[in-house]
Amino acid sequence: LIERSEIEAIFYSKKYEEIIEKIKYNDKNKLKHLISMDSDIHLEGIYSQKELIEKGKELVEAGNREFIDSKINPEEMGIMLFTSGTTSKSKVVALSHRNLVTNIMDLASVLDIDSNDRMLSFLPLHHVYECTVGMLLSMYVGAERSFCDGIRHIVENLNEYKITYAAFVPAIYESMYKNVKRTLEKEGRLEQVRKLMQEYKDKSMEEKKEVFKEIHNMFGGNIRTFVSGAAALDKGVIETFRNWGINLYQAYGLTETSPVIGIETKENSRVGSIGKALPHVNAKIEDANEEGIGELVVKGPSVMLGYYNDEEATKEVMTDGWFYTGDLAKIDEDGYI
C-alpha cells in the first residue's frame, strides 16, 4: 500500500514500530519522513511528533507564516483511500479537497445538527463514512466529538458523553433493538410497549420521547439523531426506533463519492429509501426496467478524481463525469432513491 500510494510521510504509533523498521527508506518506496506519535525525542531517521509540534510553535511565535498562509488548491487530491478489494486488487480512490468539503457542507445543510451537538465516533477514521459523516462534519459545525472505547462500550459511552448524534452501521442498531426487546421481555412489558407504540404511532417525536423515556435512557437519554450507513438496515428496526421517538435515518454512498449520495432527513424521510440526493449530487437511473429499476449513476463535485495511477479502472466506472455505482436503484416521483 505504501509503494502504490507513493506516500512520503507516515505518522505511526508504537504498535507499528517493527513494521516501520522493516520498510523505512528503502528503494521500493518514496518515504522521506517517519514521525513517531509516541517517542519524546528524535531517533535515527525518525522524528518525534511531540518535538515537531514544539518546533512548529516556536516558528509561528517567531513570525513564520509559511504554513498559516499556504494556499490549498481545491482540485488537488486531499486524501487517498484503499477500497476493500473483495473482487480484485484494491483500488486507490483519490478524493480532492473539493470532493470532501462539498460532501461535508451538503450534509450540514440538510441535517439538523449544530455546535450544540455531541457526537460519537465508532468506526475507524480511515473509513470514509466515519471520516466525513463523523469527524469532518463535527469539525465543520463545531460539534463536540468523543471517541468510543469499543463495541462493548457504545451504550456506556452514549450515556457518559451525553451523545446527541451518532453514525453507526446497521449491525449496531440491530443489536440495540434486540437488547431493548430482550429487556422488555424479561420485565414482562413487551406487549404493553407494543400497544403504546401503536397508540402513539402518529404522534410527534417529542410526545413519543416522553412516553418512551425509559427506552431513550437506555441510549443515554440525549440522542436526537442516529444515522445508519454502509449497508441496508431492516425496515422494521427503523420503524421501531422512530416509534420510540428516535430519529433513525438511512444514508447511502460509496468511497468514490466522498461518500454520501443520499440521506434521509427530518424534512425528507421515507422508510425503505435512502432519502433524496444531496444538494450537489445529480442522480439518475440508467437502463431502467419496467419497474424503473436500473443502475444508479451520479455526477457532481463530490465524485472522486479517479483511481490513483489507474486510468483504465477509472474509465470503467466514469463517463463524462458520471460515476456508475454498480448498484440497482429506482428514483420515485418525489425524488426518493
Residue ranges and their predicted role:
Residues 1-54:
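Structural core segment of the AMP-binding/adenylate-forming
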Residues 36, 57-82, 89, 112-118:
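Conserved pre-ATP/AMP-binding loop-to-beta segment of ANL
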Residues 39, 194-246:
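Short gly/Ser/Thr-rich phosphate-binding loop of adenylate-forming enzymes
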Residues 78-104:
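Conserved AMP-binding A3 loop
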Residues 103-107, 175-180, 226-227, 235-239, ...:
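Adenylate-forming
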